């Protein structure tokens, strides 16, 4: 009887601990959604993950680096390039591209070895800022919930600004300011259309693809992005959607 009561007390304590831990995490996410709707983002969850992973591997020279800049300090071509590459419907959806999701599901049923994603810029930003890499249903479920909250509270311009400041462009290189200075020795405000398209071309896998040593695939993707940028209307597209 004593063992039963002790065991029951332990289970109740563990249950309370789990519930409280979940509530703390949810509270932290809600606070992050509110605070980062106007405050600069000092670091992201992916940056922390990369840094800790490097230390655990003994790679003490690795430093996850980013420099926050406002949208006014980012070349319009860079904002247009990431939308052309990753999410051309970004101004119009509420965080999810249902057509792209449907196409990805059909593709993945036929091609189990080459999985296609359908994440919008909003989802990618949420994953980078609050969550972790991976394709688990748990992470995707959390991503969907947080993305909904972000879309309700933030403007599209804010989502794009944060995305551009925390996106990974290479080992230890996070955000367009750090990428522009590392690869082109200039601030993000002076990036050309070609340079912007090259940076956007590595976004699917910035560890495998390098802007400073682009493969033939990256170069082809860069040229495709440039064509898409022209078809979208260039700066006029940004102005029409209040994104510049």
UniProtKB/Swiss-Prot annotation:
A biological-process GO annotation: regulation of cell shape
Pfam families: Transgly (PF00912)
Gene Ontology, cellular component aspect: peptidoglycan-based cell wall; plasma membrane
InterPro entries: Glyco_trans_51, Lysozyme-like_dom_sf, PBP_transglycosylase, Pep_trsgly
Membrane topology: Single-pass membrane protein
Pathway connected to this protein: Cell wall biogenesis; peptidoglycan biosynthesis
Catalytic reaction(s) noted: [GlcNAc-(1->4)-Mur2Ac(oyl-L-Ala-gamma-D-Glu-L-Lys-D-Ala-D-Ala)](n)-di-trans,octa-cis-undecaprenyl diphosphate + beta-D-GlcNAc-(1->4)-Mur2Ac(oyl-L-Ala-gamma-D-Glu-L-Lys-D-Ala-D-Ala)-di-trans,octa-cis-undecaprenyl diphosphate = [GlcNAc-(1->4)-Mur2Ac(oyl-L-Ala-gamma-D-Glu-L-Lys-D-Ala-D-Ala)](n+1)-di-trans,octa-cis-undecaprenyl diphosphate + di-trans,octa-cis-undecaprenyl diphosphate + H(+)
Cross-referenced HAMAP family: PGT_MtgA
Role noted for this protein: Peptidoglycan polymerase that catalyzes glycan chain elongation from lipid-linked precursors.
Family label: Belongs to the glycosyltransferase 51 family.
Name used for this protein in its record: Biosynthetic peptidoglycan transglycosylase
Organism: Pectobacterium carotovorum subsp. carotovorum (strain PC1)
């Amino acid at each position: 009887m004593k063992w039963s009561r002790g065991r029951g007390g332990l289970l109740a304590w563990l249950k309370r601990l789990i519930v409280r831990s979940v509530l703390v995490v949810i509270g932290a996410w809600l606070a992050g959604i509110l605070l980062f709707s106007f405050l600069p983002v000092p670091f992201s969850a992916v940056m922390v993950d990369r840094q800790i992973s490097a230390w655990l591997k003994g790679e003490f020279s690795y430093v996850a680096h980013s420099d926050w800049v406002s949208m006014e300090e980012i070349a319009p071509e860079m904002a247009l390039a990431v939308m052309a590459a990753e999410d051309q419907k970004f101004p119009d959806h509420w965080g999810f591209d249902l057509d792209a999701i449907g196409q990805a599901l059909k593709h993945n049923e036929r091609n189990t070895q080459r999985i296609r994603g359908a994440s919008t810029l909003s989802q990618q930003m949420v994953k980078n800022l609050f969550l972790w890499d991976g394709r688990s249903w748990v992470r995707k479920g959390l991503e969907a919930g947080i993305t909904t909250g972000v879309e309700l509270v933030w403007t599209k311009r804010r989502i794009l600004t944060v995305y551009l400041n925390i996106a990974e462009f290479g080992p230890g290189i996070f955000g367009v300011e750090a990428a522009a200075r590392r690869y082109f020795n200039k601030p993000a405000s002076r990036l050309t259309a070609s340079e912007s398209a090259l940076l956007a071309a590595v976004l699917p896998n910035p560890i495998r693809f390098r802007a400073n040593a682009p493969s033939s695939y990256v170069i082809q993707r860069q040229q495709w992005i440039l064509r898409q940028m022209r078809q979208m209307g260039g700066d006029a597209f940004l102005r029409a959607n209040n994104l510049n």
